[in-house]
Amino acid sequence: MRVYFPALSSDLGEEQISLRQAFVAVPSPDMGREDVEVLEDDAQVEAALASLILLRDAPTHAYARIVLATDIQTDSVPSGTGVLEVNNVRCDWNDVVAILADDGETSEQVRRVIEAEDQDQADHAISDLWEFPLQWFDVSERDALREILK
């Protein structure tokens, strides 16, 4: 199952990803391929938003949205369809199939989200940030990405 983990730049240097919430896309049986792709994108967006929350609570990390796309088996998926949150899921780098992240050029936009003083500022900053899609990195590029984000 594809599970999307929000991450911080420090996670890129760790051997194991710490236990945290993650997101999965669970399509309904009647969904077409295109609808499933939209649902997967929505799960990535939820994980990216969650990465901003992690960053807000730990602002010494690089200002970047980071999502780890993993293929893992988990029994903790709640019943239902749509984008679902799963908790207390553990994975390691062998499970990661891709890293979705800002490439460092959006650090100012991410900083504006993190430092927003009210909901209106945050909403505007997030809207501006979402003009920049996450970049796809192969898991073998994790050290290079860590250097980019320093």
Q: What positions do the PLM features span?
A:
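Glycine-rich, aromatic-bearing surface loops/beta-hairpins
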Residues: 70-150
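Arginine residue identity/basic-tract feature
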Residues: 2, 20, 33, 56, ...
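Charged/polar, solvent-exposed surface patches and flexible loops
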Residues: 10, 14, 49, 53, ...
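Positively charged, polar, low-complexity stretches
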Residues: 19-76
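Short, extreme N-terminal segment that most often corresponds to the first beta-strand
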Residues: 1-27
